[in-house]
A protein has these predicted regions:
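Bacterial N-terminal signal peptides
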Residues: 2-11
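Low-complexity, Pro/Thr/Ser/Gly/Ala-rich linker/spacer regions in secreted
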Residues: 473-475
Length: 475
């Protein structure tokens, strides 16, 4: 393969850059870019079947060569720059037979060290405060691949999952408020969904507080999500694409908006997007027709204010260029102080009003909810079992203790034990976590009524479900 030859010499390529001064700031930033001869859709670990590399270039510098920073690797991807822009995390694969692992190098490509040493594929790393990293771990290949978000020390020690249910969780980026931005399926179901989408979620670095950030459109998927300076989230949103199609349109969620909005035209195909400077982002855009076997992704600037594409920043006739990130310092994200109690094996969950549901007429479920049945998801095959039932008060409130780190979902029962509404997504609580919800798929734009729930007036302790001596859990 061509990467064997690349490993024998320092690779410098003359490239074509934009010379349009209107597109470029006074000091164009350096970029880290992933280049690949072939980009494949599908499983995260199989995106680059012929290999890939990370190069550094000066955006907007005409005819300046690029420098290969990952010589000796069959494939490298997912560059993530440290807040001081001195170091870079990336996913690397020394040979085609080895799994992806997380590596770190200096910004110029020297001083490489391996962070993770897993038997599974580890990709999409991001820097966390206080010498930690987060990444996506993929435990299998093909259509049934399962992925979870992991956190580890910067040397790879104390690696542990922070997501526990189905959904194919993938790390997208770290928000300035200290939460991790994830993408995963919606709903978070272990059963195939014909109209399933991939949506954005937020989670704390200790795995608590998982919440849907925005629900995606039916059949859509999100990739390459990152935060802009004004707090907007920008990402690539694809519709009903085929199994061999890659990319989609640019979309964003602005602060205070309830829904995402497409900001590019149908027919344009983008593979990645990342903040550049001011109102500009750097995008990877397909430059040839989608049905062309020689289609490539090239780098362009895109103005989010005018919603117009700028001139090409970089073009290589041999490789697609994508996942471009600016090699620039940025503010350090806030550190989240965990309040979990890892000596406990349970978590608590309170629902304020199970009647609240944005899917029901008038926003409220009809009928009388008498109890809630709790189901747990266990084992590699995803078998579910009933953990128990608990009472629901007349105001729709209930309060539970459940085993920690166990995916659970709920079924609302009437006075005869008939299911009124069944939750599709699996959720969990971390050890010692107190987790609350406003209702049953309630409207996120509305706050709960300012009242003390009846369940807390009648019971000062939660109802235990699935708690027994065999699992060692105690309320």
């Amino acid at each position: 393969m061509f990467f064997l030859a690349l490993g024998l010499l320092t690779f410098l390529v003359q490239a074509e850059f934009s010379q349009d001064g209107k597109d470029l700031p006074a000091a164009a930033p350096r970029l880290l870019v992933v280049q690949a001869a072939e980009v494949a859709a599908g499983n995260l670990a199989d995106r680059f079947p012929q290999g890939s590399r990370i190069v550094q270039l000066q955006s907007g510098a005409p005819a300046q060569p690029v420098v290969n920073l990952t010589q000796g690797f069959f494939a490298a991807a997912d560059p993530s720059v440290s807040p001081d822009a001195a170091r870079v995390l990336f996913a690397g694969r020394k040979t085609a037979r080895e799994p992806w692992q997380i590596w770190e190098m200096k910004a110029g490509g020297s001083g490489k060290r391996q962070v993770t040493h897993e038997h599974a594929d580890c990709l999409q790393p991001v820097y966390l405060p206080r010498n930690q990293v987060a990444y996506t771990r993929v435990d299998s290949h093909g259509a049934g691949a399962a992925s979870q978000a992991y956190v580890a020390d910067s040397d790879g020690g104390h690696a542990h999952p922070i997501t526990f249910g189905p959904g194919g969780f993938q790390v997208e980026s770290l928000l300035r408020d200290g939460r991790i931005l994830l993408s995963a399926s919606w709903p978070l179901s272990n059963a195939p969904q014909a109209d399933a989408a991939r949506a954005l979620y937020v989670i704390r670095t200790d795995g608590s507080g998982l919440n849907l950030f925005r629900q995606g459109a039916s059949g859509s998927a999100v990739d390459s999500a990152s935060e802009l300076s004004d707090g907007s989230l920008i990402f690539v949103q694809s519709g009903s694409r085929g199994p061999h199609e890659w990319g989609g349109q640019l979309a964003w969620v602005q602060p205070g908006r309830l829904h995402s909005q497409l900001i590019t035209q149908p027919g344009e195909v983008f593979a990645s997007v990342h903040a550049l400077d001011g109102d500009r982002v750097v995008v990877s855009r397909k430059t040839l027709p989608a049905n062309s076997s020689s289609a490539r992704f090239d780098l362009y600037s895109f103005n989010t204010s005018t919603r117009k594409l700028g001139s090409a920043l970089y073009h290589d006739p041999q490789y697609s260029s994508l996942q471009a990130v600016a090699l620039e310092p940025r503010p350090t994200a806030r550190y989240y102080w965990t309040i979990l109690h890892y000596d406990l094996k349970t978590g608590r969950l309170i629902c304020l009003d199970a009647y609240q549901s944005q899917d029901a007429p008038g926003g409220r479920l009809a009928g009388t909810i008498a109890a809630v049945r709790v189901l747990g998801l266990e084992g590699e095959q995803g078998g579910q079992r009933v953990l128990g039932t608990a009472p629901v008060e007349s105001d729709g409130s209930f309060y539970l203790t459940v085993p920690a780190d166990l995916p659970v979902r709920f079924e609302l029962l009437d006075t005869k034990g008939k299911v009124l509404r069944a939750q599709q997504s699996w959720v969990w609580t971390r050890p010692g976590e107190d987790r609350g919800c406003g209702g049953c798929h309630e409207d996120k734009a509305q706050v709960p009524a300012n009242r003390w729930p009846l369940i807390l007036k009648r019971f000062d302790v939660p109802t235990p479900v699935g708690i027994n001596a065999s699992n060692g859990a105690k309320p």
